[in-house]
Every structure is written in C-alpha cells, then in structure tokens.
Amino acid sequence: MKQSHPIQVLTKALLAAFVLAPFAVAVAHADESLHITFFQIAHADPDGGRLCCSNSSDYVLPGLGINGLPVLNPGGEGGAAAPLDLLGDNEITWWSPTHDSNVTYTGTGIVTLPYANDSFFAVNGTGSLGDGDETYYQAAILSGTLSAPTTENISFSVSSDDMVFVYLDGSIVCDDGGVHAATSVPCITASSVSAGNHTLQVFYVDLDPTGAALEFSVNTEGITTSATPEPSTLAFFGTGLLGLAGFVRRKIGKSA
C-alpha cells in the first residue's frame, strides 16, 4: 500500500486548515452584522448634561482624525455649547479611553442589521433610565465591512438620541449631531461607491440624562455588511495552525 510522504501530510493538513478557517470566521460573523464596541462616559464628564439642545447635520468635519475619531466642525453645533472633550486637532474623545480619563471600555459584541435599541443606556446598551444615565452615559462604535455588488450610491437611515456619525472608508455619510430626542435622518453617499468591500463605522453617543436610542439600517438593496473579525479570532486560528504543525511534526518524528 502506497504511503504519503510526511511532508505531504503536513502540507495537506495546513492547507486544509487555511481553507476552512475563513468559513469558520464567516459563521461567527454572518452577513447583515456589525461588530460593536461599548464605552461608558462618567456622569461627571464636562460634556455630560451641558450640550442640550440642538440638531445639526454639520457637527463634524468630512473625515476622521489621525486617531480615527470624529472631528468637531467648530461653529457647527447648531447653536448649542461646543464640546470640551477635544484633542488639539478637535477630535472628539467620547469613544477613546486612551485620550479621555472619563471614558471606559466595557465590552464588545455582534449586532445584526437593521439595528434598533430605544433604551440604549449603560452598561452596554442594556440599562434603563434609572440605572444608566444616572451614573454613566453610553457610547459605542459599530464597525465592519460593507460589500457593494455594483458601483452605486448607497442609502442609510439613522435615528439617534443623542448623536450618531456614520463613516464609509473614513468619510462622513450620516451626520446626526447635537443633543436631541430621537429623530430619523435618511442619508446617502455624496458620490457613487465602487463595487467591492468598504470600511463602515458608526459612532454613537448619549450625553443627556433624559433618553438614549439608536436605530441604524442600510436601505440600498443588495448591500451586505459583516462584522470584521476581531484580532482575538485571528489569533485563535494562528495558534491553532501552529499547534497543528507541531502535532504533525511529532507524528513525523515518531514514524522516522
């Protein structure tokens, strides 16, 4: 009976692992999903409870800052007070424990679209008015890959209490700034989006103790979204492949 060479065994095993890994990731991160990262903002934060009330579709500049955060458009606050949680380049730090001591990372998860939470209080969007805004304000970033089958304009709908900013490939698409009750804001890309994969980011924050809500959906048919694999997921597969390689080498050593 013909036996496979040990090197062939190792090659086939590793190849099979590489082929199957993307399918395993796809199961965990199915279409119409986004990754969500939660933050809570201390009630004592200088921006908490002081930015009411306004609606502004010009609250932030067109692109993200060097730290990957929304950048305030000075004078675009719609008549309300300007935020104080700013870096030198006017990046807003409500989503950055690194740059804001009042912000704390509290967890991650996967959400499906359309997403709707009319009680988006801390902790992690599961609280209520009585136990959420009384101590912390809620912030979150939804992120993932948006896949367009053809080159086209893409339409979204958002509704937020208080603010939400949607970016595609780092450029603003939906700007629902200001502290206000939940309002529905339809928005569409300023120009055609090329077919293929694009980076989607949704920045949400609640800063006033009277309500917290977020709704987000993609209106254009044929568009899919998927949660970007977390580094821990990729590390899992990397560790598994190394372990598999070690196992096969040990088998080769015993058979030699």
List the predicted regions and their residue ranges.
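Bacterial N-terminal signal peptides that target proteins for export
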Residues: 2-14
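Short, low-complexity interaction segments enriched in Ser/Thr/Pro/Gly
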Residues: 9, 248-251
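Bacterial N-terminal signal peptides
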Residues: 13-22
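Sec/Tat signal peptide C-region and signal peptidase I cleavage site
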Residues: 23-30
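Acidic/polar, compositionally biased interaction segments
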Residues: 31-227
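A short, hydrophobic C-terminal helix/tail in secreted or cell-surface proteins
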Residues: 229-248
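Short, charged juxtamembrane terminal tails flanking transmembrane helices
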Residues: 252-256
